[in-house]
């Protein structure tokens, strides 16, 4: 490489004149005189002052043999992290959801059975001796197999699993630990002689050290099954006694957008160590599918959901639970990177062309949303509301203004699987859905108040016809839907609960205004009697005795049998995860019904009538 051409000295201020046309050559190496480096080209004084900066190292490689300096860096310092563009596709079988792929960054981990599993359930971590594969989130894992991973296959557990050197500082010793280092016994066991050992510093007393915490410990428990730990089912009175003290208690486990995470299992067992009930408060995305959340709470923790009100779940540990022999799982030291999943929004969704999808998206811009979701709200009825909205329209939009983008995308993915529906757009913080071409109504034929009437009976209709043509007499008027399916369901529930009266065709044809008024008055009395039948405290006067009232109450077979059947059904309910079971308020449940004429107001009326 020829030396650079000489340059003229650059102009400088007074007192700072550049006396050299180029930078002075570096000094020769006294130890290795042959190792000389060529001078670097001069740098403009405007950009860099040579007096304030040191010379750059030599770029010439040594020609003679000499001591070489090898740079060894740990792979953890150049490992991929959240800001690196790491992407590794998973095997085709795992991406198609047909099997699992085992990945391991360290050969020793693969030989010991420690591996990262990529399969239909997402990204999980397998450890030897574990009862199940660990995941970061058990309830919010997508139901689609991942396409690629965003970080190397490292296990997010104990420090020995990651090749990272110790670069921190040892914690300060406490007074007790310093005493242990000096060999001073803090207490002497009764009835035992202290063993002594001789060392270079004199007589040192053996002291039992503190047990070290094993972050990678995996213990499935004492081998008992979940049914053996739970024991016999709880009676309604026991459930009431367990749940009531925790209703207004603030000692609870909060579940947010990530759902039931792995480290929450340890927190649940910490709650169970001091109390039999663990109160779980759910907000946000997991409340869309509370059945799924309750299922994973029971399966992963081993407990039993005995009561649920809205987004609050009460988890029971079991009759034979022992904190000393409980299962122990390692803690995740960091949140693993989320894998790459298929896109939720497609240009041409399943069953539609691109032109049809674009047309539906244009219609959805002017569509009014059926509801607006609040941040960290409770969305228990969202699936039902979307299903009811699809009964009247093929497009449904939900307003998610103010929510995190990842939140309403997770909500859309849940609605796609639970409703089911076809996702069209997430634009403008709105979830736009279509009910799909294979949609079928959940209700029977809608109820109508106008029966089929032959057109020949409607003279006014034929006269008012603009075409002045009378159609065939056998043709009938098309049915006009007076009640929508949702309103029909409300009417049906009102009739079943004796809050509404349904008349057949014969009664409706013979109905007159006077008879209608009489019928309404009779029904109002009956509905009030049904509505106001509730347990009350029986207060009797001196004439009537409590024995006669209790005997009359016990002899009332129909009402007591109905109440007994209702209580038996609640006790023998096999599936406590059903929403209908949890909607029952167990603290205001009707345990019995009072016979007619036994209320205090009835005794007062009888006394006034006799006077």
Swiss-Prot record:
InterPro entries (UniProt xref): CAF1P_plant, RNA-binding_CRM, YhbY-like_sf
Record's keyword annotation contains S-adenosyl-L-methionine: no
Top-level taxon in the UniProt lineage: Eukaryota
Ranges of Polar residues composition bias in the record: 55-72
Gene Ontology biological process terms, A to Z: Group II intron splicing; mRNA processing
UniProt keyword annotations, A-Z: Chloroplast, mRNA processing, mRNA splicing, Plastid, Repeat, Ribonucleoprotein, RNA-binding, Transit peptide
Location of this chain's protein in the cell: Plastid, Chloroplast stroma
Transit sequence range: 1-58
Claim: Plastid is one of the keywords in the record: yes
Segments of this protein annotated with the region Disordered: 1-72, 554-578
Region annotated CRS2 binding, chain positions: 486-509
Molecular functions per Gene Ontology: RNA binding
Cellular component annotations (GO), alphabetically ordered: chloroplast stroma; ribonucleoprotein complex
Leader sequence residues: none
CRM domain span: 232-328, 350-446
Pfam families found in the cross-reference section: CRS1_YhbY
Gene3D superfamilies: YhbY-like
Complexes and interactors: Interacts with CRS2 and RNA. Part of large ribonucleo-protein complexes that include group IIB introns, CRS2 and CAF2.
UniProt function note: Required for the splicing of group IIB introns in chloroplasts. Forms splicing particles with CRS2. Interacts with RNA and confers intron specificity of the splicing particles.
Protein name: CRS2-associated factor 2, chloroplastic
Gene transcribed to yield this protein: CAF2
